[in-house]
Curated annotation (Swiss-Prot):
Signal peptide: none annotated. This is 3-isopropylmalate dehydratase small subunit. It comes from Bradyrhizobium sp. (strain BTAi1 / ATCC BAA-1182). It comes from the Bacteria. Catalyzes the isomerization between 2-isopropylmalate and 3-isopropylmalate, via the formation of 2-isopropylmaleate.
């Protein structure tokens, strides 16, 4: 998993509340267990028309936001079913940070496991970030995980809280496998001792 230290990029405003995981990645994309290639399915029912052409009104199809790295979203983002494909799709599209007032619990946990930083902020701070994001090509935000702050294009800052353990994992690029490998020396030592006591 890639480390998350400081992220600077365009922020796309998605002013929709209760975006569920079915909307993030529709069911027809759930047949794969690969984490790559799902970006094309991200918000596909909103990004594409029935004939397969792009919907120019959807934010991620607009030129300024095609390469967005940050998503500023309405309340209760990622609610619904527990599909881990939702953060996979966001990550494959290039989004590494989602900012909202609240998240679905399972989606929130899955983000951390996949190198995405979900940030909870107050409604007042979210409104401020929406204003920043709506600047289009000038909608660059900087997310500094070490200092736990979001810096806007005018230099304004928004502070956020994060669990210290999850912060450690993101800063060091540690997923569940990485956390296990951190204990490799202890595991090897334990297994060696077991081998010496095969009768036990």
């Amino acid at each position: 998993m890639d480390k998350f230290t400081t992220l600077e990029g365009v922020a796309a405003p998605l002013k929709i509340i209760n975006v569920d995981t079915d909307m993030i990645i529709p069911k027809q994309y759930l047949k794969t267990i690969k984490r790559t290639g799902l970006g094309k399915g991200l918000f596909s029912e909103q990004r594409y028309k029935d004939d397969g052409s792009e919907n120019p009104d959807f934010v991620l199809n607009q030129p300024a936001y095609r390469n967005a790295k940050i998503l500023v979203a309405g309340d209760n983002f990622g609610c619904g079913s527990s599909r881990e494909h939702a953060p996979w799709a966001l990550l494959d599209f290039g989004i590494r940070c989602v900012i909202s007032t609240s998240f679905g619990d399972i989606f929130y946990n899955n983000c951390f496991k996949n190198g995405i930083l979900p940030i909870r902020v107050s409604q007042a701070d979210l409104d401020k970030l929406f204003d920043d994001a709506e600047r289009g090509a000038n909608a660059t935000l900087t997310v500094d995980l070490a200092s736990q702050e979001i810096r806007g294009p005018d230099g304004g800052t928004v502070k956020f809280d994060i669990d210290p353990f999850r912060k450690h994992c993101l800063l060091n690029g540690l997923d569940d496998i990485g956390l296990t490998l951190e204990k490799k020396a202890s595991i090897d030592s334990y297994e060696a001792k077991l081998a010496e006591r095969a009768w036990a």
